[in-house]
C-alpha cells in the first residue's frame, strides 16, 4: 500500500490544532538516520505526490539503505537494499510479521479478519494454511484454466473488432482480469460481478494511503475531517449485502448438489471451497461468513489489480523495445504455428516470454513499497534499535533497480534472467516483486497464470505499434501509485491482425 496523504486535511489539522500538540520529550535513541522532521507532521510533506517509491529511493541515496521517517504520530523505517531487506524479511522476519493496521482494513474487513491485513497470530496461521492448502494450490489454480482460456480468447476477439482505432489495452486488461478472478472466486458470470468489481475498485481507491485516522491514531476527534470513514462504511454495507446473497446462493446450490465429501458437482469456485472447509469444521477458529467475505475480498483485490497492471507494463515495455517485441513474437509464433486453438499447456515452453514477465515485474513491481508491516518486538537492524510498533516499508522498486546488483538497471532486458535461478518466491532478496518471508503473497501462481496466456495470445494474433506514427521511445511511462503501481495514462496502441504467411513473405 502506498503513502498518499490528503494534504488539505494535514494543513487544516496543523493550523487549527497546532496548540494541542507538543513534541514528546521521549525520543528513542539509536534510530536509523533520516531527513529532518518538521514539528507535528514530521516527513509527510516529503512524500506528497504520486511516486512515493521514487522519492524514497532518492532519499535513501542520501540517508542510507535503512532510513527513519516520522509520519505525524507514526514512526517508520524504510528499507531500500537487498542486504537490509534480508535482515527484516528473513533474519528478523518474525519480529516484523504483524501488519500495519489502517482504517481501511479495520472498517471494510471488520477488524482485519482476512489474511492480508490480519496480524500474525494463530488465526492468521490457520487462514494462511487454508489459502495455501485449499485455495491456491497448483491443482486448484490449474482447475481454473478453462476460465483463463475462455477470457483470454474473449480478449483477442474484442481486439479484433476494434482494429480501426487505437486499442485501449488498459481497459481491456482490467476487464480480462476482473472476469477471470470473479469467475474463479464467486462462480460463472455471477450477476453480482459488475457491482462487486466496482466496490472493490472503490475500496482500493479510498484506501490507497494513510488517512488522518492513520496518521494521528491517538486523536479520535480528528478522524472525521477527511470523511473517509463514512465512505468506507457505505462500501462495507453494500459489500455485506452482496456477499450475503452470494453465500446464500452458494449454500442453496451446495445443499442440492454436494456429494459425500462435501464437494459440489462440477468445479468448485473459491467460495465453494471455503464453505466446504467451514462445514467440515474441526478448526481452532471456526470460519464465519465475515471471514469468507474478507478472504474473497483479498483475492479479488490482489487478483485483478496485480495481473492487469503487469500486462499493461509488459506491453508498454515491449513496444518501447522493438527488438525484444520481435524476439518474443518470433518465439510465440513458432510455438503456435499450425494450431487452431491455443491452450495454457502451449505456453509452458515459452522460455523467452517468461523472461519478459520476470523483467516487467523487476521494473514495475505491483506494490513497489510492498504492504507496510509493523514491528512486534524490539530488535536491532544494522546496529540501529527498532522499537515495537514501528512501521516497516520495504522499497521493492528500489531494490529491483539497484545498480550494484543489476547491470543497466533502468533498461528492459529480459535476457538478464537467462540461466539464473531467480524465482518469484523471494528466495533472492534482490528480486521481491511479491515480497518475501512469511507475509509474502500466497497467490503468485494464480497471478502469473493470469498473465502468461493473454500476453502470448496478444503477441501471436497481432502486430503492435504506436498510434499515429509516434516513436516507441516517446511512449508516456509516467506512473501513479494507488493500490498498485499503474500507468498514469491508459495504454493506447495500434494493432493489426497477424496472418501466419507474413513470416514467409
UniProtKB/Swiss-Prot annotation:
EC number: 1.14.-.-
One of the record's GO cellular component terms: membrane
Residues noted as binding heme in the record, renumbered to the chain: 441
Subcellular location per the Swiss-Prot or TrEMBL entry: Membrane
Transmembrane domains' residue ranges: 1-21, 442-462
Keywords in alphabetical order: Heme, Iron, Membrane, Metal-binding, Monooxygenase, Oxidoreductase, Transmembrane, Transmembrane helix
Protein origin, superkingdom: Eukaryota
Gene Ontology molecular function terms on file: heme binding; iron ion binding; monooxygenase activity; oxidoreductase activity, acting on paired donors, with incorporation or reduction of molecular oxygen
Main location: membrane
Membrane topology value: Multi-pass membrane protein
InterPro entries according to UniProt: CYP450_71D, Cyt_P450, Cyt_P450_CS, Cyt_P450_E_grp-I, Cyt_P450_sf
Gene3D superfamilies named in the record: Cytochrome P450
Cofactor(s) needed by this chain: heme
UniProt xrefs under PANTHER family: CYTOCHROME P450 71D8 (PTHR47953:SF16), OS08G0105600 PROTEIN (PTHR47953)
Protein family per UniProt: Belongs to the cytochrome P450 family.
Function noted in UniProt: Probable heme-thiolate monooxygenase.
Protein name listed in UniProt: Cytochrome P450 CYP71D313
Species of origin: Panax ginseng
Amino acid at each position: 500500500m502506498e503513502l498518499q496523504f490528503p494534504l488539505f486535511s494535514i494543513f487544516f489539522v496543523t493550523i487549527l490544532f497546532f496548540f494541542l500538540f507538543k513534541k514528546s520529550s521521549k525520543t528513542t535513541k539509536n534510530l536509523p538516520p533520516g531527513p529532518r522532521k518538521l514539528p507535528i507532521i514530521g516527513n509527510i510533506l516529503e512524500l506528497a505526490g504520486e511516486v512515493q517509491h521514487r522519492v524514497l529511493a532518492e532519499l535513501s541515496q542520501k540517508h542510507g539503505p535503512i532510513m527513519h521517517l516520522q509520519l505525524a504520530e507514526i514512526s517508520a523505517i524504510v528499507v531500500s537494499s537487498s542486504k537490509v531487506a534480508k535482515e527484516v524479511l528473513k533474519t528478523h522476519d518474525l519480529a516484523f510479521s504483524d501488519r500495519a493496521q489502517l482504517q481501511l482494513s479495520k472498517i471494510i474487513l471488520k477488524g482485519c479478519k482476512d489474511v492480508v491485513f490480519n496480524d500474525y497470530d494463530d488465526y492468521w496461521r490457520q487462514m494462511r494454511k487454508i489459502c495455501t492448502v485449499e485455495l491456491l494450490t497448483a491443482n486448484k489454480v490449474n482447475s481454473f484454466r478453462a476460465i483463463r482460456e475462455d477470457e483470454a480468447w474473449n480478449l483477442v476477439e474484442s481486439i479484433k473488432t476494434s482494429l480501426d482505432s487505437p486499442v485501449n489495452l488498459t481497459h481491456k486488461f482490467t476487464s480480462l482480469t476482473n472476469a477471470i478472478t470473479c469467475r474463479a472466486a464467486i462462480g460463472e458470470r455471477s450477476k453480482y460481478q459488475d457491482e462487486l468489481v466496482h466496490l472493490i475498485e472503490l475500496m482500493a481507491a479510498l484506501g490507497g494511503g494513510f488517512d488522518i485516522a492513520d496518521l494521528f491514531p491517538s486523536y479520535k476527534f480528528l478522524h472525521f475531517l477527511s470523511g473517509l470513514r463514512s465512505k468506507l462504511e457505505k462500501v462495507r454495507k453494500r459489500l455485506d449485502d452482496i456477499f450475503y446473497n452470494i453465500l446464500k446462493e452458494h449454500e442453496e446450490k451446495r445443499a442440492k448438489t454436494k456429494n459425500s465429501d462435501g464437494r459440489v458437482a462440477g468445479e468448485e469456485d473459491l467460495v465453494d471451497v471455503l464453505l466446504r472447509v467451514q462445514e467440515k469444521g474441526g478448526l481452532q477458529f471456526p470460519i464465519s461468513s465475515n471471514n469468507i467475505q474478507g478472504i474473497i475480498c483479498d483475492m479479488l483485490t490482489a487478483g485483478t489489480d496485480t495481473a492487469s497492471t503487469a500486462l499493461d507494463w509488459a506491453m508498454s515495455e515491449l513496444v518501447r523495445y522493438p527488438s525484444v517485441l520481435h524476439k518474443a513474437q518470433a518465439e510465440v509464433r513458432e510455438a503456435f504455428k499450425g494450431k487452431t486453438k491455443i491452450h495454457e499447456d502451449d505456453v509452458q515452453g515459452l522460455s523467452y516470454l517468461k523472461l519478459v514477465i520476470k523483467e516487467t515485474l523487476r521494473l514495475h513491481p505491483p506494490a513497489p513499497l510492498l504492504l507496510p508491516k509493523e514491528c512486534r518486538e524490539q530488535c536491532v537492524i544494522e546496529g540501529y534499535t527498532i522499537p515495537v510498533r514501528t512501521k516497516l516499508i520495504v522499497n521493492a522498486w528500489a531494490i529491483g533497480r539497484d545498480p550494484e546488483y543489476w547491470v543497466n538497471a533502468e533498461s528492459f532486458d529480459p535476457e538478464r534472467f537467462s540461466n539464473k535461478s531467480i524465482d518469484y518466491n523471494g528466495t533472492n532478496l534482490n528480486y521481491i516483486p511479491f515480497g518475501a518471508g512469511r507475509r509474502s503473497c500466497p497467490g503468485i501462481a494464480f497471478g502469473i497464470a493470469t498473465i502468461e496466456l493473454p500476453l502470448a495470445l496478444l503477441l501471436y494474433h497481432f502486430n503492435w505499434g504506436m498510434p499515429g506514427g509516434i516513436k516507441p521511445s516517446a511512449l508516456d511511462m509516467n506512473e501513479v501509485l494507488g493500490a498498485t503501481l499503474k500507468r498514469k495514462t491508459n495504454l493506447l496502441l495500434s494493432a493489426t491482425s497477424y496472418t501466419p504467411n507474413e513470416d514467409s513473405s
